[in-house]
């Protein structure tokens, strides 16, 4: 097609194709990325003018999931896509994080990157295609961008890295890793893992980076060809606004000694975050007043002067803190580079919840609460992936009072959703299977105080809370946030960073795991990337910090409680013949409704015949179980029953061996007069009367399928058989009835 550029690279055995010039021609840059059967249109557009009055780069990334991409029609009454799903929000963050550091720090034009998923191949996840597309679209546009970057996902199967694993390979993988970077450096790492050791994790990251180098070269070639065809724009030469040297000298002369004094006093006197912020704010105001005193003419001639002075003061503050760390090995709160803030752990903090854990590390404090529910409480995921659900959920709340602010509380933002997902991913491999623990599990982390690393505080609080709730997790998990200060060849890696170190440092590297290995990892950086040696040091230092924190957790609660909270529901389970499900449900759900009304329990019936009963009242649960047993029990030939005589005839007695329940008929059979006793019986009434309970043995069925019973043979048996059921543990499930509804039918 004339005026259209298409270029293809084979990645992990599948074609990665970039196309431009056909779609979204008015965007600053537009690329259709195709990988396998997945197609994502990514556009990058910038405003004509910079936004006034801001001191940050206004980048927005939107990830738009269109359900037509997966051949689905949206549910609900409106039948169109609404607010982004959690998966879409996390995918938008995944695109944002590696590209953000590559824009000029002084750039103030609004930049909007939109990734629209238009076709989905389950073997080729669209979020990685979205990162590649964003990089390519930005390279085609006139937006200043120090790219390109590439991205891949990496799995680990039999201890071997697998690039861009398929859906089937992913199900066998012990690692779900996304890596993004330039040709020279890694920019972002995001991972969930099943206790992967540090050396294997590093190997997977570096293997991913090797493939990224090919993708980066491919995008550079794509841009060069697009530029030759007039399908790409030249990048403008931008010059960062700077203070006049005389002004810079004046600012440094006034600001440096004053800021240095406050920062060193904060270190030596170990000020709190609020005290340090208060003193620094006062110091900045004093510096600003001294600098601008009597400078009315200069201010009138250069309206940008106050903003430039403010930026330089912040830069000087950053230089002092970083120099102190690099040259003295001491941090702003007086800690050494590897020192972790004081930790306290508590469990059982809330009296009537199912489990609670309070984790405090310095001024960061997180309370995590566990709630257990029936499997019907699991979350159904309605997105572009295969139909699935999750029974373990973690939600993270960051109220304004946690940082001493007074502002309205809104719906959870992208940051809260991202932090919640990270903490969820860290604990997920340790959650017991449904067979072992038949509950839906919801954790909520309330950040009560924040001075850095609240997401890792949520991981530690989650471990405490789950163990307090009696959830038999496979191993405790802890998390720690690592930081980096890098100036040329000088490198300092910080363990357990606080808010100021996060703001003034070069990296926020969060690592969570058990004593055996990593379960979650997330890296965000602000410089042009880090190399293998830095990453290796950070992982090893994080391991030491994680083990230290795990010891603190285990000193508080060495193992999960043996008993659940008295306020948590108890689970009973029984397996029935799948053909008997209709006997429990009844026409229009009549029977199961009746059971629920009479006992007050919750009942889940699975397609494979497993029935789960949840109740906080043990007696009610047992009653519901007995009702279900009665409704579904078959008479077994050779089994002895204690039955009730329902009527007497000349030729024998009819005996009900499985009683009536909820108005539904029981199961009865005939004891022929010849089977009433070992001796000859002249009259049935001489042996049994209507209403009597007698032992009978099921000896078979007649040609019409009617049950034949024998009292004579039962008298020779020494024991009475019992219906089988088990408590608490149950087998896994493949979906099925949810109380009154079948999930597959109701969707």
Swiss-Prot record:
One MF term in the entry's GO annotations: magnesium ion binding
One of the GO BP terms on file: RNA processing
Record's GO cellular component terms: cytosol
EC number in record: 2.7.7.8
Keywords, in A-Z order: Cytoplasm, Magnesium, Metal-binding, Nucleotidyltransferase, RNA-binding, Transferase
EC primary class: transferase
Domain KH span(s) in chain numbering: 569-628
Entry-linked PANTHER family: POLYRIBONUCLEOTIDE NUCLEOTIDYLTRANSFERASE, POLYRIBONUCLEOTIDE NUCLEOTIDYLTRANSFERASE 1, MITOCHONDRIAL
Family note: Belongs to the polyribonucleotide nucleotidyltransferase family.
Descriptive protein name: Polyribonucleotide nucleotidyltransferase
């Amino acid at each position: 097609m004339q005026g259209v550029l298409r270029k293809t690279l084979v990645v992990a055995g599948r074609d990665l194709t970039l196309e431009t010039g056909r779609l979204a021609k008015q965007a600053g840059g537009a690329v259709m990325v195709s990988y396998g059967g997945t197609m994502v249109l990514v556009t990058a557009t910038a405003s004509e003018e910079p936004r006034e009055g801001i001191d940050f780069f206004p980048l927005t990334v939107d990830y738009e999931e269109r359900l037509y991409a997966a051949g689905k029609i949206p549910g609900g009454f409106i039948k169109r896509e609404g607010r982004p799903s959690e998966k879409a929000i996390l995918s938008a963050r995944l695109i944002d994080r590696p590209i953000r550091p590559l824009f000029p720090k002084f750039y103030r034009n609004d930049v909007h990157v939109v990734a629209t998923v238009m076709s989905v191949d389950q073997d080729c996840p669209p979020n990685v295609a979205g990162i590649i597309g964003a990089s390519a679209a930005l390279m085609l546009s006139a937006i200043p961008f120090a790219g390109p970057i590439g991205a891949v996902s990496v799995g680990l199967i039999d201890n071997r890295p697998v690039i861009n694993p398929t859906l089937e390979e992913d199900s066998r993988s012990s690692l779900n890793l996304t890596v993004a970077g330039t040709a020279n450096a890694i920019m972002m790492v995001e991972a969930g893992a099943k206790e992967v050791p540090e050396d294997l994790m590093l190997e997977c990251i570096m293997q991913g980076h090797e493939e990224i180098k090919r993708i980066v070269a491919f995008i550079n070639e794509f841009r060069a060809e697009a530029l030759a065809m007039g399908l790409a724009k030249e990048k403008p030469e931008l010059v960062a606004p700077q203070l006049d040297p005389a002004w810079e000298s004046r600012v440094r002369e006034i600001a440096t000694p004053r800021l240095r004094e406050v920062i060193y006093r904060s270190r030596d006197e170990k000020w709190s975050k609020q005290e340090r912020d208060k003193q620094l704010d006062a110091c900045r105001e004093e510096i600003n007043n001294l600098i601008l005193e009597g400078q009315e003419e200069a201010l009138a001639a250069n309206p940008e002067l106050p903003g430039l002075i403010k930026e330089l003061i912040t830069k000087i503050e950053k230089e002092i803190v970083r120099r102190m760390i690099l040259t003295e090995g001491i941090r702003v709160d007086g800690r050494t580079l590897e020192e972790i803030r004081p930790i306290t752990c508590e469990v059982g903090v809330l009296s009537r919840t199912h489990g609670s854990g309070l984790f405090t590390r310095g001024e960061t404090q997180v309370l995590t609460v566990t709630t257990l529910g029936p499997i019907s409480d699991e979350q159904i995921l309605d997105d572009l992936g295969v139909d699935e659900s999750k029974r373990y959920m973690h939600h993270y709340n960051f109220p304004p009072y946690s940082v001493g602010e007074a502002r309205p509380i809104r719906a959870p933002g992208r940051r809260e959703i991202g932090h919640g997902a990270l903490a969820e991913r860290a604990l997920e491999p340790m959650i017991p299977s449904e067979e072992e623990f038949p509950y839906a599990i919801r954790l909520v982390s309330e950040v009560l105080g924040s001075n850095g690393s609240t997401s890792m505080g949520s991981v530690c609080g989650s471990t405490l809370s789950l163990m307090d709730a009696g959830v038999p997790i496979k191993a405790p998990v802890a998390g720690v946030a690592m930081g980096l200060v890098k100036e040329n060849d000088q490198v300092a890696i910080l363990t357990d960073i606080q808010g100021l170190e996060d703001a003034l440092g070069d990296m926020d590297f969060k690592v969570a795991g058990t004593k055996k290995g990593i379960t979650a990892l997330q890296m965000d950086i602000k410089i042009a990337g880090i190399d293998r040696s830095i990453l290796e040091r950070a992982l090893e230092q994080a391991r030491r910090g994680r083990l230290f924190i795990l010891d603190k957790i285990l000193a508080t609660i060495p193992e999960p409680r043996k008993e659940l909270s008295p306020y948590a529901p108890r689970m009973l389970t029984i397996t029935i013949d799948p053909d008997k499900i209709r006997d429990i449900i009844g026409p229009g759900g009549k029977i199961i409704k009746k059971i629920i009304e009479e006992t007050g329990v919750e009942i889940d019936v699975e397609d494979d015949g497993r029935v789960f009963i949840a109740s906080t009242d043990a007696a009610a649960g047992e009653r519901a179980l007995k009702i279900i047993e009665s409704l579904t029990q078959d008479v077994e030939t050779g089994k002895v029953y204690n039955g009730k005589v329902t009527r007497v005839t000349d030729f024998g007695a009819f005996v009900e061996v499985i009683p009536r329940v909820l108005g539904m008929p029981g199961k009865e059979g005939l004891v022929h007069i010849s089977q009433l006793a070992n001796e000859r019986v002249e009259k049935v009434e001489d042996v049994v009367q209507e209403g009597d309970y007698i032992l009978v043995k099921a000896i078979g069925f007649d040609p019409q399928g009617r049950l034949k019973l024998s009292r004579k043979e039962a008298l020779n048996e020494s024991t009475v058989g019992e219906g089988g059921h088990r408590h608490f543990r149950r087998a896994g499930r493949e979906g099925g009835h949810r109380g009154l509804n079948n999930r597959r039918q109701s969707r």
